[in-house]
Amino acid sequence: MAKFVIRPATAADCSDILRLIKELAKYEYMEEQVILTEKDLLEDGFGEHPFYHCLVAEVPKEHWTPEGHSIVGFAMYYFTYDPWIGKLLYLEDFFVMSDYRGFGIGSEILKNLSQVAMRCRCSSMHFLVAEWNEPSINFYKRRGASDLSSEEGWRLFKIDKEYLLKMATEE
C-alpha cells in the first residue's frame, strides 16, 4: 500500500471507531459483549475530561474498503499510574482490518503510541492479549513485549457493575 496516515481520532470518527471495535470483538469471538454506542464514544472520548484517546489509520480513496470506509485501523488508549514505576500508557484496543494487515499499518500505529508514551514520560505500555491470539502475541514479542502473566504470575480480575453498586450502597 502506497500510503496511509496515522492521526489522532476526532469526534467525526466515532462511527468508524465503533465499527472497528465491533470487528475486533467479532475477531475475538466476543461480538455480543459490545454494548457501547456511538454516543458513548463521543461523550467519553471527546468531552471536557476524555476517558480515552484514540489513533486511527486512514487510507487514501483508492484504497477504501468496498463499503467506502477510509478508516481501517485504530488504537484506543489511556493513561494510568503504577505506584511502583509511575506513569503507564494502557493500550485498551488495537485493531487493523484483515485486508490491510501486512502493509506496516499496525507497526506505524505502535510507533506512534510509543512516541506518545515517551513524550508523556511513561515507564511502559501495558495491554492484554487473548491466550489463543498467537499472531498478536508474536507481533508484540517481536517488538520487545514481555508476557507478565507467565513471567510474573499476575491474574486479571474484574468487578461487574451490579457488584460495584452493591458495595457502593452497603451500610
From Swiss-Prot:
Pathway: Amine and polyamine degradation; putrescine degradation; N-acetylputrescine from putrescine: step 1/1. This is Diamine acetyltransferase 1. It catalyses: an alkane-alpha,omega-diamine + acetyl-CoA = an N-acetylalkane-alpha,omega-diamine + CoA + H(+); spermidine + acetyl-CoA = N(1)-acetylspermidine + CoA + H(+); spermine + acetyl-CoA = N(1)-acetylspermine + CoA + H(+). Belongs to the acetyltransferase family. Substrate binds at Y27, E28, E92, H126, F127, L128, E152. It is linked to Overexpression of SAT1 and the consequent putrescine accumulation might play a role in the pathogenesis of keratosis follicularis spinulosa decalvans. InterPro entries: Acyl_CoA_acyltransferase, Diverse_Substrate_AcTransf, GNAT_dom. Homodimer. The active site is at Y140 (proton donor). Enzyme which catalyzes the acetylation of polyamines. Substrate specificity: norspermidine = spermidine >> spermine > N(1)-acetylspermine. This highly regulated enzyme allows a fine attenuation of the intracellular concentration of polyamines. Also involved in the regulation of polyamine transport out of cells. Also acts on 1,3-diaminopropane and 1,5-diaminopentane. One of its GO terms (biological process) is regulation of cell population proliferation. The gene is SAT1. It is an enzyme of class 2 (transferase).
